[in-house]
Amino acid sequence: MTIDTLIDAVIGREGGYSNHPADRGGPTRWGVTEAVARANGYRGDMQALPRDEAVAIYKRLYWQRPGFDRVAAHAPLIAAELFDTGINMGPATATGFLKRALNALNRNEADYDDVDATPVIDDATIAALRSQRRCS
């Protein structure tokens, strides 16, 4: 599963433009909220947000910056879940879920030292993930 496939699925679910009063995100296009679009340099009308700009935001904010692309090299299905969770709950939350799971599965540090609680996919996180992949 490639990042482009994952992004296409998100955009397919999220649809085009929305500004529903019950949605706390406010104006949204392609699943990208106005706040996220503005924080990433988009200045135009949200109804006109180009799809390719939304794709670039998804890749940068929810795949590359949190390091989920690194996870994908070892566990693509886990990376896909991190990507989806990161979009809905924030990349830091998704990373925290992964790290807590890795720590819960390491048999009281028998396989590796606990990974730290920082919201970063670092070398220790990848090593722990690889260790779990060898054990499965």
Where do the PLM segments sit?
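Cell-wall polysaccharide-cleaving catalytic domain and substrate-binding groove, primarily
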Residues: 1-136
